[in-house]
From Swiss-Prot:
<comment type="function">
    <text>This is 1 of 5 proteins that mediate the attachment of the 5S rRNA onto the large ribosomal subunit, stabilizing the orientation of adjacent RNA domains. Modeling places the A and P site tRNAs in close proximity to this protein.</text>
</comment>
<comment type="subunit">
    <text>Part of the 50S ribosomal subunit. Weakly binds 5S rRNA. Probably binds the A and P site tRNAs.</text>
</comment>
<dbReference type="GO" id="GO:1990904">
    <property type="term" value="C:ribonucleoprotein complex"/>
</dbReference>
<keyword id="KW-0689">Ribosomal protein</keyword>
<dbReference type="InterPro" id="IPR018255">
    <property type="entry name" value="Ribosomal_uL16_CS_euk_arc"/>
</dbReference>
<dbReference type="GO" id="GO:0003735">
    <property type="term" value="F:structural constituent of ribosome"/>
</dbReference>
<dbReference type="GO" id="GO:0006412">
    <property type="term" value="P:translation"/>
</dbReference>
<dbReference type="GO" id="GO:0000049">
    <property type="term" value="F:tRNA binding"/>
</dbReference>
<comment type="similarity">
    <text>Belongs to the universal ribosomal protein uL16 family.</text>
</comment>
<keyword id="KW-0820">tRNA-binding</keyword>
<keyword id="KW-0699">rRNA-binding</keyword>
<dbReference type="GO" id="GO:0019843">
    <property type="term" value="F:rRNA binding"/>
</dbReference>
<dbReference type="InterPro" id="IPR047873">
    <property type="entry name" value="Ribosomal_uL16"/>
</dbReference>
<dbReference type="InterPro" id="IPR022981">
    <property type="entry name" value="Ribosomal_uL16_arc"/>
</dbReference>
<keyword id="KW-0694">RNA-binding</keyword>
<keyword id="KW-0687">Ribonucleoprotein</keyword>
<protein>
    <recommendedName>
        <fullName>Large ribosomal subunit protein uL16</fullName>
    </recommendedName>
</protein>
Amino acid sequence: MSDKPASMYRDIDKPAYTRREYITGIPGSKIAQHKMGRKQKDADDYPVQISLIVEETVQLRHGSLEASRLSANRHLIKELGEEGDYKMTLRKFPHQVLRENKQATGAGADRVSDGMRAAFGKIVGTAARVQAGEQLFTAYCNVEDAEHVKEAFRRAYNKITPSCRIKVERGEELLIA
């Protein structure tokens, strides 16, 4: 069965449901890694720091976080090479557990379905709660690679729901000159 539309889980309208020690059957996170690029190099070694900042308070499902991470990282690998001199971090982790009260449809569904009886729902996935103004991705790079990082972030925010902006946190004076 396919996933429900992200609009069902986008708004933060329920209390946090994150206590994994009490919840069984949580599917694994689709996010393969949170740190990409040259992991052994320190972030302070790079002159430019660029972040993707979310402008709305939303929940982002782990599938969309992985899709945006993959899109950005693939672009950077393609442009800067497999051993490219950059470091990128996904800053959010999907702690929020999502539930869904499945409904039967079609002929005879009224006899099979329980309706709203025992409507707590089954676990279907996880999501990250992101507040407005928080950083979703941060990349550290050299001055000549900054445009590639901005393009990678543009591709990343096309994969997620909220509007985002790309902000140069450090080294803006180097990019203007």
